[in-house]
């Protein structure tokens, strides 16, 4: 091969190639294929520039004879082939005189007519794969890319080929000749296979050993290597290449790439039907707390003691009665269950020593509410495998529900500030490194914005309830244990406060698998009259249990106090995640942090302080039918936190599906906004996948309606 190179190429080109290789510590005698590739590339660059001039009128002309006309200026500046220092000097001087953006990598030519740098590529592989690698490396809109292959194909940025047909034909003919010459000497195959992908500094991450073998084994058919596949995947250009590729890969696939324009997307279709109902494990905005300040009673911190103490702060109890029955339930049983709780709490007080936990008597009303003996008997498969008509229960399709306004109100409420702090700042040691100092500063600013947020109250309430329920489920499997729903906070003045929201009674809980269900009955205090939005409370039986005196601007008013009772269930895995709800704080902090980082990298200094302290600046919070909503940085923190908390409270398969599928549509719309000219195939299928998740879940329906607002404003 070395002999061939020295015979085939002009001695000046050979010398430049040797010099270039030596600069990188490579030996032309050993790396002969690389030697040939560099010579070829140099020759193409020179041929690209040959005979092209700019006349005195600034027009591009072709002059092939040795016309000694001094007024002609070379159209192209050749950068390739110079030593690095000289090459960068030329590039800098061009940038200074023309104002063109300075490229990150050394380009090959500069075109004085079009005022742009040109990156020339010569490839033994497919032009579009090599083009994408180049584009990936260059990462600049300003540098023009032009790729030639040894088979006569070419590809250039925006299909703008710079040169006339004849000049390009000359280059293609020369490349074809080189290929023929190599083939006749038996050198072509080795040369063709030796081409490596473009390396960029940041992507020189090698996968080796077992991981490499696994990667190569798991490639789709028709791909020889991981690099090949990577380039192919990165290379989505909606110009026809991909349709051909898809049809090569499978006869069943025929994808027509459709351009995605402002008029393409339609709004998501939300389901019709009765309004959706509340399905959280505990009440949110409607919860009412019975509280004690500065608790110092005997046994303080033991939930049952705290609960009894809180119950004693209220004097307005009255004979309970059902005000909103549960359509499908036996409502008198819910009433009896509450009366039983009151009676058994009274019994505890009459005892000399209050116990630490309370197991309820297994009355008929509790057995009914907790589904005791309701589970079908389990039969060993061996005993029934011969039954001819063995089949699974038919299950009904879920009934579609429409979006109701209460879920938006719930979300708004979760973003609000309360008058208590729900977060104790953990003591973390002194900062040692500067990065720790920045981290502490960010954490402290963020905490200040969210510690009083209602979403933080929901986190603490969720953590407490799930921890207590999981503990009881393991410690008292067969008992109907009474579990108070408690939270702790600090008032504005810094006084400690213990709150009681109501009670849970747990059913039998022999939880072997993560998904085994434990039933529980929840009984929660509230001042919300259920008759105002009966559809929200479909799953509840609501009792009126007392009258509460409230201080208002016009003096004291008496309001009825309600008890929201329902049967519910959860599993080990759900309780485990519920116990980890504090992660929501971390997730929203990270989202805020990425906003700070973006700001800091623009300003080239840490912007944490300015970010939180510049009260005049507003930030986008979300979309509503009115347009993009904006607010203070504190509001952004609380909104992000509330979203994260609701994702946890309303976790469901519908949410998983909606998030994953709608994200794809979101990315396409973002690409359109960024003027990246996205193309799609089977957009109808994507809409189907998204809309199949819009059934009856209130949080998913709300997110879908927000998504529609976003579509409207993004595509204006």
Curated annotation (Swiss-Prot):
Keyword vocabulary terms for this entry: Cap snatching, Endonuclease, Eukaryotic host gene expression shutoff by virus, Eukaryotic host transcription shutoff by virus, Host cytoplasm, Host gene expression shutoff by virus, Host nucleus, Host-virus interaction, Hydrolase, Inhibition of host RNA polymerase II by virus, Manganese, Metal-binding, Nuclease, Phosphoprotein
Keyword hit for Hydrolase: yes
Protein name: Polymerase acidic protein
Reported cofactor(s): Mn(2+)
GO CC annotation: host cell cytoplasm; host cell nucleus
Gene this chain is encoded by: PA
Gene Ontology molecular function, alphabetical: endonuclease activity; metal ion binding; RNA binding
Main localization (coarse): host cell
Organism per entry: Influenza A virus (strain A/Turkey/Wisconsin/1/1966 H9N2)
